[in-house]
Amino acid sequence: GDACNLVSEMHNYDLVFAGNLIDRLYQPQLFLDSMTQRIRVGGWLVITSPYTWLEDYTPPGYWLGGYVDNTGIPVDTFTGLSRALHPHFKLGCRENIPFVIRETARKHQHTIAELTAWHRVE
């Protein structure tokens, strides 16, 4: 499926989990904007990601972080998520989650994702 173009029948959820997804969407803001229609007030949006923004997946103009803004200030993805979800979601928790991806029998990739849990407040 296309997380940026979900069918309208998908709504009134208590929880949406977006595991290692946000930095692989072609327009992550579309996905985040749709969460106000998908998650009921009182529900949760949980996002995990190492925030590895790559042009192969997301054009740089759509990145939520990992860039320098037009005033020269670096923007990290957590800040971008916070801006994108305000005022409909309030941060509930923020944790680092380490994980390992096996590439071959002798090569593994150790990565730390950030988990954020956002409470739908309005």
Predicted region positions:
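A short glycine-rich, Lys/Arg-flanked "PGG" loop and its adjoining helix->strand segment in the class I
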Residues: 29-41
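Core SAM-dependent methyltransferase catalytic element
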Residues: 94-122
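A short SAM/SAH-binding and catalytic strip from SAM-dependent methyltransferases
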Residues: 15-27
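Short N-terminal helix/helix-N-cap motif within the alpha/beta-hydrolase-1
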Residues: 8, 26-30
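Short "lid" loop at the C-terminus of a central beta-strand within the Rossmann-like core
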Residues: 50-57
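Conserved Class I S-adenosyl-L-methionine
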Residues: 58-94
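A short acidic, Gly/Pro-enriched loop at the edge of an enzyme's catalytic core
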Residues: 4-16
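Conserved beta-strand signature within the Rossmann-like core of class I S-adenosyl-L-methionine
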Residues: 42-50
